[in-house]
């Protein structure tokens, strides 16, 4: 197989694996407290990723750099995973996938707000479109805050926002430690932080964990191994071989995979509101990606 086909195959596999994890996460948090589940997922996946990719760390942190690693771990892993799990307990896989797909647009918003970038007109339009998509999904047009999935959607939005802020604040750390190296560091630090809660949950609720149905255990194992360890590793494999703009475009597949799977098992219903929200949100992401691609061509850099 040609090298480029292997890369694109890896990216397709990443989106398939990650697209399914909205459903598997929901299956788990229906039986396990979402915060305890997030702690268990982080602890196990963090140790595995650190062991697998410790040699990718270009330079280990020293002194105050550990504080930055701790902050990035809190934003990019702990807050992200905890609020995602809490949100998926209260919303649907289709809603969750659509909101998490706003990460590229939220990243742009933070980069502009913090002075790292200046938004072009196309990027400003992208922010407006994505915001409109979120408001439609949250039923803001009805001027009420009582939607069936409002709380869950908002919790997932906090997760997406936290991860977007992590992406913006991690740029210097990526240069210091390497992309996969930083991931190993923040996952390892997060595993240490969440280990006490994981141990307490495993001991205090041993009966609950041991009596989980087989399908829940399989969903939990899938989420930890395939939707965390494998996807992180494949994503960085691809980032080392094709431009990041091409990697980002594959995120479009997540809502399609998550929604179709969720509808197939009866956990979602395809509505006009969901379609309109998807069109607006994905339109915003498309404008963001195209604007970065245009800037790269104009600067003579690879897209």
Model-predicted segments: where are they?
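Juxtamembrane helix-entry segments on the extracytoplasmic side of multipass membrane proteins
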Residues: 3-7, 31-35, 39, 61-67, ...
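Specific alpha-helical transmembrane segments that line the substrate/conduction pathway
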Residues: 36-47, 76, 84-127, 159, ...
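Glycine-/small-residue-enriched transmembrane alpha-helix faces in small-molecule transporters
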Residues: 1-39, 86, 145-172, 180, ...
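Hydrophobic transmembrane alpha-helices of multi-pass small-molecule transport proteins
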Residues: 49, 70, 110, 119-141, ...
